[in-house]
């Protein structure tokens, strides 16, 4: 776990997220060519906005899995907004034919799934905190 720690001026952290979001109406538009471009875009967005993408994959042509690490100053909602907003706009610019398969000019569903990923379980944290008062 210690090798995953990120050191900032005022804190040390290890904040990881597994995110999943899908194409509007679950349309299967994420072809190999679109996926390759999207993977590049996601890396560029992450670098520009200050977080790290460790793993990115498209599933079944209609949804995306992304594993990221981020500093505490970046909320998960901001990260998702950057990834979905910027990638959606740029994919429409690069592949205008995608727009024909969707309505209202939106590529991604409004919702998303996110889960914190860590090396310490909830049970370990509870046990550690419960034993703090017994140390004195």
Tell me the role of every PLM-derived stretch.
Residues 1-136:
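Basic nucleic-acid-binding interfaces
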